Amino acid sequence: MDVVKKSRNVHGSNDFSELIVSVRRVAKVVKGGRRFSFSVLVVIGDEKGKVGCGIGKHLEVSEAKIKAVNAARKNMIRVHLRESRTLHHDVKAKFCSSKVMLRSAKVGTGIIAGGSIRLIFEVLGVQDVVAKSIGSSNPHNVVYAVFAAFRKMLSPKQVANKRSRKIGDIIENR
């Protein structure tokens, strides 16, 4: 039972936005029957380039969400953005059978993405991006595929070092 819930909270002193991607009721089969609990997938971000995801499991949804937020805080990564609105370059990644393609976009394009990918870009602070999900649409796998893509991205400084050029040459040729 996957439910996409958009609940935006500003939590604690770090000012992170939280969005619930999915809430599932899971069952553990034991000798006496089934034991039900909840699994919550959450993405958090500061809307300035930092984003994290986490999963929490508990008997109650609210406790599972707290666990997921704590896991997401431990799993934060920094994504370098161009002009604080889009990605620096296009990137593809795969996690299990979910593949994602993320492309930078011109000003005014908006977030063209579906489902859980859109939620990630909202908390990341991206305003213009085109994203495509291919294969499995399982929210967990799609979220992890997007994070794999973020880890593959290079900052302009890394690209300049790789090409033995100055950062200004890389940025001005866009």
UniProtKB/Swiss-Prot annotation:
Protein's name according to its UniProt entry: Small ribosomal subunit protein uS5
Record NCBIfam families: rpsE_bact
Species the sequence originates in: Ehrlichia chaffeensis (strain ATCC CRL-10679 / Arkansas)
Self-association state and partner proteins as the record states: Part of the 30S ribosomal subunit. Contacts proteins S4 and S8.
Domain notes: The N-terminal domain interacts with the head of the 30S subunit; the C-terminal domain interacts with the body and contacts protein S4. The interaction surface between S4 and S5 is involved in control of translational fidelity.
Gene that encodes it: rpsE
GO biological process, one term: translation
Molecular-function annotations in GO: rRNA binding; structural constituent of ribosome
Key words, A-Z: Ribonucleoprotein, Ribosomal protein, RNA-binding, rRNA-binding
GO CC aspect terms: small ribosomal subunit
Origin: domain of life: Bacteria
Gene3D superfamilies: 3.30.160.20, 3.30.230.10
Stated role: With S4 and S12 plays an important role in translational accuracy. Located at the back of the 30S subunit body where it stabilizes the conformation of the head with respect to the body.
Family matches, as SUPFAM superfamilies: dsRNA-binding domain-like (SSF54768), Ribosomal protein S5 domain 2-like (SSF54211)
Residue ranges of every copy of the S5 DRBM domain listed in the record: 16-79
Similarity comment text for this entry: Belongs to the universal ribosomal protein uS5 family.
Pfam families named in the record: Ribosomal_S5, Ribosomal_S5_C
